[in-house]
Amino acid sequence: MVIDSDIYREQGVRQGQRQEPLLAVRGNIYDTKNIPLTRNIIHYSLGAHPSKVKNKSEFANLISQSTDREPDYYLKRLSSTADFVYLERNLRRDKVEGILGQRIPGLVVDRKFRRSYPHTYVGSQIIGFTDVDDNGLIGIEKEFNAFLSGTNGWVVKQVNGDGISQIKTSFPIKPPVDGANIQLTIDLEYQSILQEELARQVTNAQAKGAMGILMNPQTGAILAMATLPDFNPNLPGNSPLENQKNRTVTDQFEPGSTFKVVVATAAVATKTVSLFDEFYCEDGQFTVAGKVITDHEKFGLLTFPQIIAHSSNVGTIKIAQKLGQKPLYKYSRDFGFGTITGIRFPGEVQGVLRQTKDWSELSLAEVSIGYEVAVTALQLASAYSAIANGGVLLKPRLVKQILSPNGKVIYKENPEVIRRVASKEIMSTITDILVQVVKSGTGTKAGIQGWLIAGKTGTAHKFIDGVYSKNKYISNFAGFFPADNPQVVCVIVLDEPRSEEHTSELQSQAYLVCRLLLEKKKNK
């Protein structure tokens, strides 16, 4: 007579079965032309149930032949009293090829996917990377982790006395659901060009770092986005955390003269000035609220367009004084400053744009020339896109679409209008002024023969420990091309170039990027 036969029968069934996971494959990330930016490489881990291994010496020799590790290492592992021990982790398939087809009592082969990034540094801060459990830690990998991850399944297998399992068709199974694939708006070719040119600029200017963005002003699509120093996502532990940040969205800076387009737009839109109005620029020196504001040249009488073209601080401040606080603040907000752009990417900051009630007597002057205001490179690119496309502020986009494993579109980002900043006619006027900047003003080195380029430079002293540094700068350039039918907005930022003189060189370097892009377009 068997007592509690049902209990023993259930225990016997449990001992003869094992539920094993069926791993979902993480979705991949692609550029806008479907070039893969990620890969999933299968890695194998070897383990053993020591009590199930009949001949430990023979077992150790067999494993050693595949891994080239001494058999004694495995014999020591197999001497453990634990029910299960790992022998090797993260082996490539070629290492375990001789083992996979064999039924070896006590051996457990665990298969997992590991993320790989074939283009290493290119686009690394956009793409991000995953942890050992394949969860996204930064970048697109983190922001869209829920789409990429998929859902693991499981299968119940029959296990014999040697611990070897096999599938039985009558046993239950839950298939895995693979992750979705993401297609970005990023063009890998443009991304490579941008990063190469940023690296060249950092070297030439002996700068601390650099940022750059290429954006389609008609759609809000980000074509390229980079920060230097960068990192290799295949070896994230080899670089500082600071290098892993996409600082075009996470870091803010005072833009200096690239912000003057806000004053110009507001002045034209409110009819505060006309193209023929003249302002005396005080021979390059003007005192406001006890602070002396200077120009890079001793300008006298300049028209409104000349003030922007020659980047006169004194002239810009006089326009702002005629304009007033509220219109300047309104158009600054309308251009998207002081608030996040809404891009789907982790860590975006909103910048700094204080309400007018918090302004001092000096603030109107300072804000008009790009001080007392902090922006991100992405905000600057979005603002210049609004000028380029005829007055509409668009939400910037990094993701084109997300597709299920069978190719069905499950998420798509279309161009999204945030607001109209100004009329097409007003933005056409601002564009004409920015073309003059490149042709004859402070941006002459940015010109490309045969193409109309519109752009503006800016330089601001860095604010460190409560004071403005005398010798540390942020230099930046924002512009678009072709000016008569804008296709690309280009923003380049240099962090602490060797001297302020590198601002003019920056324009030339920024449009080397544009020149390369134009050549690519012409050759297609």
Name these PLM-found stretches:
Residues E505-K524:
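Positively charged, low-complexity/disordered segments
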Residues T38, N160-F171, G212-S257, V262-E496:
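Beta-lactam-recognizing serine transpeptidase/beta-lactamase-like catalytic domain environment
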Residues Q191, N313, Q325, Q509-A510:
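Alpha-helix N-cap/helix-start and coil->helix boundary motif
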